[in-house]
Swiss-Prot record:
Signal peptide stretch: 1-22
GO CC annotations on file: endoplasmic reticulum
Tagged with keyword Glycoprotein: yes
Alphabetically ordered keywords of this record: Chaperone, Endoplasmic reticulum, Glycoprotein, Signal, Wnt signaling pathway
Record protein name field: LRP chaperone MESD
Known partners and oligomeric status: Monomer.
Bias-annotated ranges (Basic and acidic residues): 180-220
Xref: InterPro entries: MESD
Gene3D superfamilies in the record: 3.30.70.260, 6.10.250.640
Gene Ontology molecular function terms on file: low-density lipoprotein particle receptor binding
Region: Disordered, residue numbers: 56-77, 172-220
Glycosylation sites: N187
Length: 220
């Protein structure tokens, strides 16, 4: 609202200046000092510079500032859970633009991906989440958030959907409900291997103890 009002005021000021310039007598205009550029010949770059100069002494609402000029949101360390690293990321990404990649399962066409992700976006919109969506492949889309603090809540919603294969957020891949067996088992592979290795070491140690006890009996 504030930005729109400033543009309207700027346009009105330029129009008044142009009208005043047109009404000046020809002789007076020639007698005056030569201007670098007629205001009626301003292009978009000139308008942008003029607006920037105008805004130097103007109070701009924080929400109208570009993201790189906004002051960082204060972090409430009392809300950080040491056992949940995601809680730290939520606070550090609050108020910042964030993107996540979403993969649709079932080898869909680009049109199907468009329809499915559109339904997800609509559900998020109804839940008051401001999300933009861009299709980047036959089965992939980007969900962009203006406030990254809500990214993990949106991720939880997406991975609970039947056709969501996975969500990639901040370099971390989260398997979705629609992931196939290999995707779902990916995170379980390492714990299972570690358990088997531990059991093998335990069994080996037990055999060595039995051999040592048997040898002691034979020596006696």
């Amino acid at each position: 609202m504030a930005a729109a009002a400033r543009w309207a005021a700027l346009g009105l000021a330029l129009w008044l200046c142009a009208a005043a310039h047109a009404e000046e007598p020809e002789g007076k205009r020639r007698a005056g000092p030569a201007k670098k550029k007629d205001i009626r010949d301003y292009n978009d770059a000139d308008m942008a510079r003029l607006l920037e100069q105008w805004e130097k002494d103007d109070d701009i609402e924080e929400g109208d500032l570009p993201e790189h000029k906004r002051p960082p949101a204060p972090i409430d360390f009392s809300k950080i859970d040491p056992g949940k690293p995601e809680s730290i990321l939520k606070l550090t990404k609050k108020g910042k633009t964030l993107m996540m990649f979403v993969t649709v399962s079932g080898n869909p066409t680009e049109k199907e991906t468009e329809e499915i992700t559109s339904l997800w976006q609509g559900s998020l919109f109804n839940a008051n989440y401001d999300v933009q969506r861009f299709i980047v492949g036959s089965n992939r889309a980007i969900f962009m958030l203006r406030d990254g603090g809500y990214a993990w809540e949106i991720k939880d919603f997406l991975i609970s959907q039947e056709r969501c294969a996975d969500v990639t957020l901040e370099g971390q891949v989260y398997p979705g409900k629609g992931a196939d067996g290999s995707e779902k088992g990916r995170n379980k592979t390492k714990p299972e291997k570690a358990k088997k290795k531990k059991d093998a070491e335990k069994s080996k140690s037990s055999h060595e103890d039995n051999r040592a006890q048997t040898k002691q009996r034979e020596d006696l």
